[in-house]
């Protein structure tokens, strides 16, 4: 029968420090596997030597989440090739290859488990890895684990076994293809090609190594019991194996979380996880002993420790020796008829956090072993490696061991109370009876749930005329059991406790007219435990606790007491879990909106003290919610809120949280924010500069008007005389105001960006034009550099001195400050950009328009174009459209206004000469 084959790593083409190929010899939740060197040459290869010559049936590869080889080739050989052993020239024989998923659909957050079915005989296996490319990795490949499943290549024994099985089937009249007796089903473990789920790679990679060895031993005992026809005991062992698989998964997650905490140097959390594992392991082993499932196991200490040894090297004398099995004892004489779950989980003091896993192991099935007295080589316990998973894959949350669906077999009575339980619950026993309390203390969750439902029914049926003392005793006993059930990790038990607590507060107390002291007693005894459950690792339990606390705070019986707000405004503890801190601040924000600050227990003082302290929390979500709380308080009490905050100055605004808070205040008040204020200030400054420049030019024009007028009159008289003498009809006269510009002087007095030509455009004049007036240019508000508007976005992202403070929005493709980028992307209010071939994108008005260079001029300079180009209005008012593209006379026409206002009269000849020039041009 195929089973797991042990192997050692003979050679590899290289590895990164801390990720040797020898890591592949270990299967455990915390292994890191092999990684090729960085910037390595491809292909990379690994050679494995199996413990014996065998027939390989199945190969399993667990790939890395992003260091993924595009193709893995497999080669097999009976002995080492020539380049490894010089005196043997045999080469590897190629089996084929497999392609691995590029993992883009999951965002490189999951690992692929690839299974390959082969049929090849040999002792050496070579794997060749080819290069891959994704956005996270371009020069490295990795393999987390590899599993080889096969059987010894002794064909004679195999054929004999097959013939013997066929002979037995023949005499029994049983065909494996059409079985009649399920006990003799050939598709079950008796098949020669059957592969046990316990040999699957997924089983070892997500199971605690100690628990995995216990599961394998229980599986052997289960098959032994089935052979002896002790079916009740086999059924009990099967249920224990199923429960232990969930226990092993949880312990494996705890181990990964502990290693991750050590990696982050969070030693308090690591110590907490270690203690949590020890308590949980001791609890599980105690239940196994209680049910007689650890009989035959070696003596254990708490926590249980199995000898975990690494695989021996091929040269070691112990390499080919089998590991002796643990001593076995007789099975239990009495058979248990209970078919319910064997292991019942108890609440722990500290809740575990969610762990990321890649795949849940399959349900354990029977896996027969040919050896009873000795474990084969490949079943040797594997050690827990000291390497930490540096890139744990993000996978969906693992479900808790208990399900909401009842797994009831034959109804079972709760076990008797222990001495400790009798002392602890003595008052509740006196009031409710030992049977009900025993059910609430039972190790079977169905009994615990039934006890709470029975108590619910009893309280509902209490008659109205009952004495007050009896009613109060019943209430206190019920609260005692509710407190215990609130800490239960089983969802249905937790729900039953919430249902019972709600009924007591809203129905039982009002019905029997008990006082506020009794309501206060219920709330004060339950609320601390409920708040603790809001930090639970299970998202479902966490949400249930949050919603119930919010609902309970709104009960009219509880709201008047103002108790719950006093718990929520307590400062966050520095060592509190992330979920607990997030839940507390979220619950405070919810209730603050529902209850307000008038007679609710919330005051401006206690809420603001809590929110300001939460601004310093290490978790971003907590700080973000604290900002939202402060803004909500400012809407209701602006003056009192400001008293708890530092002054609004440049020093305070260096903190991005306070900057966001004060800008939020400005929006609430309708005032411009800091950015809007700077923009308005720049606009006012530009308008003032524009007005000052116009006044200066007007004064210069007035002072130059007499000289220009006199020179113009003389020039026009000379031209009139010349035209009269040469050609009275004016056909050969060339117009003096449109001189032809030579090619070598075409760029003189011309702005190459907007196309305007002006005599004032000397070297200094052009600089002034670029700096203040050109419609195609703008000044960067961050580095004061003059850039083209069409390239402003690229400038902010790549050239600007403040480019590190900007990021590119994937939706609109514009540069956005990094502190505003998450909100900008989340709101999706920006206008989506189109490709450059389809449209241009204006960074001023954020609109898309026609593509091409000329379209930029139309958009930025046209009257119907960009509405956010602040230079447009000034330039258009100063220089009308016909002025662009003309010769030097265009600049003269611009100074005609001062001439009209001059005291020197305009000569009459000027008008006739102008008309004659017009006629000549025609």
Swiss-Prot record:
Expressed predominantly in the brain. Also detected, although at much lower levels, in the heart and the liver. Within the brain, expressed in the cerebral cortex, hippocampus, cerebellum and brainstem. It is found in: Cell projection, Cilium; Cytoplasm, Cytoskeleton, Microtubule organizing center, Centrosome, Centriole; Cytoplasm, Cytoskeleton, Microtubule organizing center, Centrosome; Cytoplasm, Cytoskeleton, Spindle pole. Residues 210-277, 678-705 form a coiled coil. Disulfide bonds: none annotated. SMART domains: TOG (SM01349). Residues 396-407, 673-697, 714-725 have a biased composition (Basic and acidic residues). Residues 307-333, 348-419, 673-741, 880-922 are annotated as: Disordered. GO terms for cellular component: centriole; centrosome; cilium; cytoplasm; spindle pole. The keyword Nucleotide-binding does not apply. Interacts with CCP110 and CEP97. Interacts with ARMC9, TOGARAM1, CCDC66 and CSPP1. Required for ciliogenesis and for structural integrity at the ciliary tip. This is Centrosomal protein of 104 kDa. It comes from Rattus norvegicus (Rat).
């Amino acid at each position: 029968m195929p089973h797991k084959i042990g192997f050692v790593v003979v050679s590899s083409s290289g590895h990164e420090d801390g990720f040797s190929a020898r890591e592949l010899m270990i299967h455990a939740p915390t292994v890191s596997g092999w990684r090729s060197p960085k910037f390595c040459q491809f292909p990379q290869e690994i050679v494995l030597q199996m413990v014996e010559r065998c027939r390989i049936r199945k190969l399993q590869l667990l790939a890395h989440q992003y260091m993924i080889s595009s193709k893995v080739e497999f080669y097999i050989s009976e002995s080492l090739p020539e380049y490894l052993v010089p005196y043997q020239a045999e080469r590897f024989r190629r089996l084929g290859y497999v392609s691995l998923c590029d993992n883009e659909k999951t965002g490189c957050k999951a690992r692929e488990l690839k299974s390959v079915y082969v049929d090849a005989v040999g002792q050496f296996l070579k794997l060749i890895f080819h290069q891959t490319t994704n956005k996270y990795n371009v020069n490295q490949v990795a393999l987390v684990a590899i599993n080889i499943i096969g059987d010894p290549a002794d064909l004679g024994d195999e054929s004999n076994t097959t013939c013997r099985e066929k002979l037995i089937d023949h005499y029994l009249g049983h065909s494996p293809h059409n079985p009649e007796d399920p006990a003799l089903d050939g598709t079950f473990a008796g098949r020669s090609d059957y592969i046990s789920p316990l040999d699957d790679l997924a089983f070892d990679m997500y199971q605690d190594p100690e628990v995995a060895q216990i599961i394998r031993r229980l599986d052997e005992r289960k098959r032994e019991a089935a052979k002896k026809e002790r079916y009740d005991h086999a059924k009990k062992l099967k249920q224990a194996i199923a429960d232990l698989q969930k226990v092993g998964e949880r312990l494996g997650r705890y181990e990964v979380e502990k290693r991750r905490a050590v990696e982050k140097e969070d030693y308090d959390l690591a110590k907490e996880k270690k203690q949590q594992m020890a308590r949980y392991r001791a609890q599980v082993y105690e239940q196994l002993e209680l049910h007689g499932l650890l009989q035959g196991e070696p003596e254990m200490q708490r926590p249980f420790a199995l000898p975990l040894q690494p695989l021996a090297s091929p040269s070691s004398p112990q390499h080919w020796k089998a590991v002796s099995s643990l001593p076995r004892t007789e099975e239990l004489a009495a058979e248990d008829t209970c078919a319910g779950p064997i292991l019942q989980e108890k609440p722990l003091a500290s809740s575990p956090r969610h762990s990321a896993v890649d795949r849940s192991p399959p349900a354990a099935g029977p896996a027969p072993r040919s050896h009873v007295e000795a474990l084969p080589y490949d079943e040797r316990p594997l050690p827990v490696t000291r390497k930490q998973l540096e890139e744990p894959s993000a996978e969906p949350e693992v479900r808790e061991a208990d399900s909401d669906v009842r797994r009831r077999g034959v109804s079972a009575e709760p076990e008797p109370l222990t001495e400790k339980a009798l002392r602890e619950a003595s008052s509740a026993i006196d009031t409710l009876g030992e049977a009900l309390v025993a059910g609430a203390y039972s190790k079977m969750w169905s009994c615990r749930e039934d006890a709470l439902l029975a108590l619910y029914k009893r309280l509902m049926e209490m008659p109205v005329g009952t004495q007050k003392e009896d009613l109060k005793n019943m209430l206190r006993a019920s609260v005692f059991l509710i407190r215990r059930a609130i800490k239960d990790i089983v969802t249905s038990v937790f729900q039953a406790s919430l249902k019972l607590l709600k009924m007591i507060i809203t129905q039982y107390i009002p019905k029997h007219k008990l006082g506020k002291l009794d309501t206060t007693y219920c709330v004060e005894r339950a609320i601390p435990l409920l708040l603790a459950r809001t930090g639970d690792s299970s998202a479902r339990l966490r949400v249930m606790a949050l919603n119930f606390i919010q609902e309970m705070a709104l009960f009219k019986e509880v709201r008047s007491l103002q108790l719950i707000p006093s718990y929520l405004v307590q400062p966050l503890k520095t060592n509190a879990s992330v979920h607990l801190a997030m839940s507390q601040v979220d619950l405070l924000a919810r209730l603050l909106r529902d209850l307000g600050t008038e007679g609710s227990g919330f005051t401006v003082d206690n809420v603001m003290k809590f929110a300001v302290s939460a601004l310093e929390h290490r978790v971003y979500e907590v700080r973000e919610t604290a900002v939202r709380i402060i803004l909500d308080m400012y809407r209701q009490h602006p003056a009192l809120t400001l008293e708890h905050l530092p002054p609004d100055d440049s020093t305070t605004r260096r903190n991005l949280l306070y900057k966001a808070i004060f800008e939020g205040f400005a929006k609430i008040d309708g005032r411009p924010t800091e950015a809007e204020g700077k923009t308005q200030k720049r606009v006012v400054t530009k308008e003032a500069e524009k007005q000052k420049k116009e006044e200066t030019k007007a004064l210069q024009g007035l002072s130059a008007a007499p000289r220009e007028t006199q020179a113009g009159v003389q020039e026009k008289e000379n031209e009139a005389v010349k035209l009269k003498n040469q050609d009275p009809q004016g056909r050969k006269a060339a117009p003096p105001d449109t001189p032809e510009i030579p090619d070598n002087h075409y760029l003189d007095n011309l702005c190459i960006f907007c196309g305007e030509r002006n005599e004032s455009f000397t070297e200094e004049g052009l600089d002034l034009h670029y700096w203040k007036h050109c419609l195609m240019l703008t000044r960067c508000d961050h580095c004061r550099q003059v850039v083209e508007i069409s390239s402003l976005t690229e400038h902010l992202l790549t050239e600007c001195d403040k480019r590190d403070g900007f990021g590119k929005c994937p939706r609109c493709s514009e540069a956005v400050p990094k502190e505003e980028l998450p909100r900008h992307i989340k709101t999706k209010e920006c206008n989506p950009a189109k490709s450059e071939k389809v449209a241009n994108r204006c960074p001023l008005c954020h609109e898309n328009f026609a593509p091409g260079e000329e379209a930029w001029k139309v958009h930025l300079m046209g009257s119907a174009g960009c509405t956010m180009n602040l230079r447009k209005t000034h330039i258009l008012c100063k220089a009308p459209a016909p002025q662009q593209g003309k010769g030097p006379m265009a600049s003269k026409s611009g100074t005609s206004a001062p001439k009209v206002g001059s005291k020197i009269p305009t000569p009459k000849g000027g008008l006739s000469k102008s008309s004659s020039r017009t006629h000549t041009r025609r």
